[in-house]
Amino acid sequence: MQNTTVHGLYFCHPTSIDGNPELLAVSRRSLSRGDHVTFTASQCRPKRLQCCQWHSCTISSTHIPTKDDLGKSFAYLRLLFSLDYTIADVLLIIGGLLFAICAGIPFPLLGIVFGDLINDLNTVTCSSSDRATADLSSAVRAKVLYVIYITIANFCFIYAHSTCWCLVSERLARRYRRRYFESIIKQEAKFIESLPSGDVVSRLVSDIELVQSGTSEKVGLVISTLSYFVAAYVVAFIKVPKIAGMLVSVVPCFFLMALGGGHYIKKFAGRLAEKVNAATSIASSSLSHLTLVHAFNANDRLEKRFAGYLLQSRKDAVRKATTHAAQLGCLYFIAYSANALAFWEGSQMISKSVADGNSGTSVGAVYTVIFVLIDASFILSQVAPFIHVFASAAGASERLLQVINRPSAIDGTSDSGDKTAAFGEEDIRFRDVHFKYPSRPDVPVLQGVTFNIPPKKHTAIVGPSGGGKSTVVALLERFYDPDSGDVLIGDKNFRDINVRYLRGNIGYVQQEPSLLDRTILENIAYGLVCVTEIVDLVKEAAANANALGFIEALPYGFATNVGTAGNQLSGGQKQRIALARALVREPCLLILDEATAALDSTSEQLIQAALNRVSERVTTVSIAHRLATAKNAHKIVVVQSGRVTEEGSHTDLVSRGGVYAEMVRLQNLGKLSLDDRVISGDMISALNATPETRQLLDEKQAFVDGNRSDITEDTVVADTPSDSRDGSEEEARKKRKRTRSAGFVTRYTFALIRPNLHWVLLGLAMSVIIGGSYSAEAIVFGHTVGSLSPCRSAEAISRDGNLYGLLFFILALVEFGANVVGGCAFGWAADKVLYRIRVLSLRSLLGQTVKWHESEDRTPGTLLTYITGDASALGGITGTTIGLLLATAVNLIGGLVISFSIAWKITIVLFPTIPVLLVSGMMKLRVQKQLAERHQKAFAKATAVTIEAVDNIRAVSAFSLEKQSYQVYGRALRGPYRATIKATFHGNAWLALAFSISNLVYALAYWWGSKQIAEGRYSQTQFFIVMPALLFSTQSCGQMFALAPDISKAGVASSNIVELLTTRSAEDEVTPGSSHSFQPSSSMGAQLRDVHFTYPHRPERPVLKGLNIDIKPGQFCALVGPSGSGKSTTFAMLERFYRPNAGAVVIDGVDVTRQVGTEFRDDIALVPQQNILFEGTVAFNVALGACPGHEPTQEEIEEACRMANIHDVIMTLPQGYQTMCSHDGKQFSGGQRQRLSIARALVRKPRLLLLDESTSALDVESEKRIQEALATLAGRTTVVAIAHRLNTIHRADQIFLIEDGRCIEQGTHQQLIQRSETYRTSVIHQSLET
């Protein structure tokens, strides 16, 4: 192949989905993304990557069914033949059906062979002639060969039907995945937002897994089981009709037990899962927002709520354990009772035959009937759970098909509609538009909105939050259609315009930027539609969005991956990328929804200048709370309560003295002198041109959100050790972890279990009884078979039949009692231990420092596994798992002791087969489990692609990325599908071998046993004691090996839990030299003295460089400065989320960096930049801010909400303060969430209040009300605010100007205007004076 030189950027995507490196090739005329297969199909054909930077690059080219489940099963056939099935699918289904039927027949045939072998043994026992011995040897050899032939056929049939059904399920699941994604990605926003929270994830993960599980090898197993059942009864009725008829009663007994028990287990398990999930949600939110939890010392309140949900689940957990134990006890009782009945009736029939002197009923015939019917009935009872699986699969397919077959009301992939609308040339008109969101149909959002948007002009929409501004934008993008009224461009209705064409003419920047988990280059380039010139356009757009500087400063530049939801970037950085994505397509209509809200005033001014240049040739619609960004608009529309109250230019609206004029008055920073304006005007031009300014724009923004370590605007996070003190503490913890022995872990784990040891001991005692009962059964079984020999008298046969039938029934009662008592004891113990571990784990996690949470690649998700994974694994080992282990161990030891003591010569030959049977049992269970787990894990990343697309559905729709997202999803499916198919072929071979190999061991046992009996070394009774005692018990012990992964997980979990619970928090460690206590006063003072600080994960970039500020008690102070200068980090120091590398943080005269404990936080309240709500009522979220130990009254909560201007909004809700908040609080607007955060801080009645951009999302009126409330705190509360809106802090007693980690200037607003050109420039940028 000939080499090709291509100019551009080539790099390898680091996270390939299917194991093949994913490549992205960008030339100046094309953008290509794909793996090796994709590129080899193209003309370029790259084989390897030779560069990763800009230059000329040469490339060498189980559950039980209910009545509803049974009803749903009738839809199962529609599932198998749904979604464009092919002839290959039909052939696989037919082949799987026929092979499964054939696979059920060999087992009854083996029952006949084994019964004939017993008759042969009876013959040689009754006659000791040489001829009888020779005949026996010949007969045994023939029958052993039959067993071998049947086993081989059985292996082939099982492998064939398992493979066929696995292929059917994988092909069907892939079709469902593709079609569901294709449908969901093109649905309108109204439908997506009407779905319950997590519905799409549930459909993709749960429902498609149900479809896959319900059409997999389980179908073949059920069909073969039904075939086995039918064949078994045919054989039984041919052999001994009377006993067969009696044992028919076993079938309904098994089914009644399974149906009744399964119904209640499902009921209690559902309730249990609901409450545990609620508790897990609390834990997840707490870990995700740890800084807020620490700020309010809310550990105890959240732990109490977490424990409350777990306590509510206790009753259902106990009921579930009791029901499961009773079900298991009934299962064994029915099986042993059926044995007692069958052997007793068989003994009477054989006794009568002997008394009458005819052949009649033979022992072998009785054995065959019991062997095949008890086993068939037992196995058939195991079919019951699969009925639920199949019904669930049918129900899941119906739910999926509802979406798959649903036509989208606003389809962005359709080619229908008008494509001639002249965007940028004609007016856009709203004409009497009314609208309500589907989630709130009783709340009108727009009520007769009418206004025009002139072409190639800038129209700004302003007004209070919740007034309907963003809804206007949503209608322009046609995320929704109006309930009534029209949106027109010229004379064309938006409803009649092709959706893809409409959105292709619009550039859209959301209030909360949405980025996909791709590179920066791709995220910006997604704004292009059918454009070949990419790289230059992307760079130009990035420059216009003031993003080029920080992008090129990143280690991988435009090739940097932004992470899930852009979490590798700061808020300002994401906003600039989103802006560049909108600008790159050079739209006819540019929509900006608070596009510069996260930027400082200088950055905002530079971007605003670029937008002003763009608006000269583009129709621009902007939404803004900062009126400084809207005052130069050609037209301003004031939207209030869903209506247009005013419209006109800035000058006109101010002169009218209406709503807009009042908003301007509230935001105006004060009138500067003419000289100030002239000087500042000259300075602006100079400042915009200086390298220092651009450097400031690229500075990192530290501690951006309140729940994680902050990500700068210039680097992607990399884990690095922190300062020397924290580093030494971490090393000490690692050393303690290494020195903790297995004995220490065991002792600590035992201490966790000790309070419930009596339940565990009771369960262990029952396990010993259960394990011993298997050996007892072998003894009874051997004597029963021996007592039925026709060589004995009729009276002896009848007498012993009564005795051993009674013994079997006694065993049934013992098994029932032991399983019920043991199951309940273990279930209760496991639940209590699990509760204790989960609560202690959450307590320890919330008690660790922020630094600990950020080290060693810890994330909220991985830490949550202590509660969900490790606690469950450790709790499980204290439950039925340990009981099963002990029972199987007793069973195996008892079997070996009995076998060697009764017939050691038989045992010594069969003993080497024990590992074979153990591995057989292990593989049968393990392969089935691994196939299910592999399938689930393989498609996890493909599911993540869908979740990302749905979470960012507005961005996907706005930039017409539906087809591109579908292609990404298709690539994500390709590798996992191939891997799963490959695993199916070799996995099913192990499964078939596991089901078949035990028959060969039985053949060896009968051959060797018959040889020993024929030679007179052992009796038939001894042989039939040894065989079940050794082989049956050994085969059941294979479960012990299948439990090995669970045991291993429990061991690892035990070590993890002990390490967590014994890890001391650094908050409890005090540096010698300070032991002062805090003295309450009316307000709190604070000083930062020569503070130096570097974030642990960015040691090469100091954030604070000798910061000195002095906050006097009772003052209102403000921190201002460019993004990344260290303002939020200052708050982190005051809250002691981190300890400084050097310097002191003094609060009320006490250096808190040297102080033990966190009691000082009781007098501090924080309003973080990110508005965070926890799952719970509104009242709970507000009360969370109260001081530890104090439960605020309803009056205190309402007072705080009134001060935050949110009380009236809460009272309009149907449930008022008892309204439930979701974990993300999405049912509230951004401004409402911010006001709830402020109320949470105010209910604390703090002496020091920290406000980090606390009014950035508020309208002017709400901002005014909160400013008034803060004014009432003067004197008794020290207030420190970080703000980009300078009008919110211009009355501050002291303003600290922070730049590059230092305080470069301080003073009042008027003093800084006179002394600081930087501050004066920011004031002028935000001034609304004309």
Swiss-Prot record:
Q: Where is the composition biased (Basic and acidic residues)?
A: 722-733
Ranges of residues in domain ABC transmembrane type-1? 94-392, 761-1049
Cellular component (GO) terms are:
membrane; plasma membrane
Catalytic activity reported: itraconazole(in) + ATP + H2O = itraconazole(out) + ADP + phosphate + H(+); voriconazole(in) + ATP + H2O = voriconazole(out) + ADP + phosphate + H(+)
Tell me what this protein is called. ABC multidrug transporter mdr4
Q: What induces it?
A: Expression is induced by voriconazole exposure in vitro and in mice. Expression is increased in clinical azole-resistant isolates and by the presence of itraconazole. Expression is also up-regulated during biofilm growth. Expression is repressed by iron in an SreA-dependent manner. Expression is down-regulated by tetrandrine and posaconazole in a synergistic manner.
Query: Gene for this protein?
Result: mdr4
Q: What GO MF annotations does this protein's record show?
A: ABC-type transporter activity; ATP binding; ATP hydrolysis activity; ATPase-coupled transmembrane transporter activity
Query: TM spans, by residue?
Result: 90-110, 144-164, 218-238, 243-263, 324-344, 370-390, 761-781, 806-826, 871-893, 903-923, 989-1009, 1023-1043
Note the SMART domains from the entry: AAA (SM00382)
> Where the protein is mainly located, per its record?
membrane
Q: Would you say which domain of life the source belongs to?
A: Eukaryota
Q: Which UniProt keywords apply?
A: ATP-binding, Cell membrane, Glycoprotein, Membrane, Nucleotide-binding, Repeat, Transmembrane, Transmembrane helix, Transport
| Compartmental location | Cell membrane
For biological process, the GO terms are: transmembrane transport
Which intervals of the chain are annotated as region Disordered?
717-736
Q: Which residues are glycosylated?
A: 3, 707
ABC transporter domain spans which residues?
Answer: 428-666, 1086-1325
Q: How does the protein's chain sit in the membrane according to the entry?
A: Multi-pass membrane protein
UniProt: ATP binding residues = 463-470, 1121-1128
The family note in this entry says:
Belongs to the ABC transporter superfamily. ABCB family. Multidrug resistance exporter (TC 3.A.1.201) subfamily.
Q: What's this protein's function?
A: Pleiotropic ABC efflux transporter that confers resistance to azoles such as itraconazole and voriconazole.
Q: Carries keyword Membrane?
A: yes
